[in-house]
From Swiss-Prot:
It comes from Myxococcus xanthus (strain DK1622). This is Large ribosomal subunit protein bL9. One of its GO terms (biological process) is translation. The gene is rplI. The lineage of its organism: Bacteria, Pseudomonadati, Myxococcota, Myxococcia, Myxococcales. Binds to the 23S rRNA. Keywords: Ribonucleoprotein, Ribosomal protein, RNA-binding, rRNA-binding.
Amino acid sequence: MKVILREDIENLGKSGELVTVKDGFGRNFLLPRKKAVLASEQNLRQLEHEKAVIAARNAKLKGAAEEQAKKIGAIKVSIKRRVGDQDKLFGSVTALDIAEAVAAEGQSIDRRHIHLPEPIKALGNYEVELRLHRDVIAKIKLEVLPE
């Protein structure tokens, strides 16, 4: 049985793919749970239309993310924190702190776009990665200063 997946299914395929499955798996699991639709001519045409709409929307979002990356790339933010012995911070600098500091510079970003491989717990200069889109990554310079 050929079906078009409506969502990603592990070990089977990604959303929008045309896959062949056993009849029982399709009839008893995929179709009743609306995880797939039968691969009819009408459904294939609708799939192509949806792919075109998604590609156009994705291109528009990518363009906006690239514009924002150009603006954000020039920003250098400073965050002041209380420190203890050996320049260790009380607490850490989080993605929310960085988002607020960038907002103070005039650019708003979502804290979920900020990628911190590990928490910032010491004074110094850091380069923080912002994943604005799947294909667009910007970097800002962050300086953590003592209060």
